[in-house]
């Protein structure tokens, strides 16, 4: 009788030099990229800062989830939360968010915030299911390089 090989361990760790193209491909597959934001530039900027990182969840060697996390010394923010669409509903989103929260706790940050597009009701339900609540805020933005407004 042959025994099945054990499933590869899930790991969550900060992004390294490898896998950047795979991370961008995952973000694109999840619909997170926008024409006005270069994801490679976002990754490079995040990796340069001491107050930010990109957490990567791997199943064996495959990147299955990400979260870009950072803080301003007072509040934490999370962006680019992505889970491989073929692996959703298995706890990977919860795991990567737990890791992002822990990263901020270790930095002494007591509150984490995130932004969700108003039409993305599926992800709104996910965040509510893990303890986040909608805040009564209005977000203002302005391009400082003269670009036209973006949605």
List each language-model region with its residue ranges.
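A short helix-loop-beta-strand connector motif used in the catalytic cores of GNAT acetyltransferases and
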Residues: 45-56, 77
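A short, internal acetyl-CoA/4′-phosphopantetheine-binding micro-motif in the GNAT/acyltransferase core
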Residues: 81-88, 116-117
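Conserved beta-strand in the GNAT
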Residues: 56, 62-70, 77-82
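A conserved beta-turn-beta hairpin within the catalytic core of GNAT-like acetyltransferases
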Residues: 70-79, 88, 134-135
């Amino acid at each position: 009788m042959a025994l099945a090989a054990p499933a590869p361990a899930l790991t969550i760790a900060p992004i390294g030099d490898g896998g950047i193209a795979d991370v961008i491909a995952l973000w694109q597959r999840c619909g997170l990229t926008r024409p006005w934001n270069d994801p490679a530039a976002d990754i490079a900027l995040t990796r340069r800062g001491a107050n930010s990182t990109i957490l990567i969840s791997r199943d064996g060697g495959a990147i299955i989830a990400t979260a870009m996390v950072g803080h301003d010394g007072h509040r934490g923010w999370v962006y680019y939360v992505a889970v491989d669409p073929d692996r959703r509903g298995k706890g990977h989103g919860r795991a990567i968010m737990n890791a992002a929260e822990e990263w901020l706790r270790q930095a002494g940050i007591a509150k984490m915030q995130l932004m969700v597009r108003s039409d993305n009701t599926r992800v709104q339900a996910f965040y509510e299911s893990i303890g986040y609540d909608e805040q009564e805020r209005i977000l203002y933005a302005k391009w400082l390089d003269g670009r036209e407004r973006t949605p």
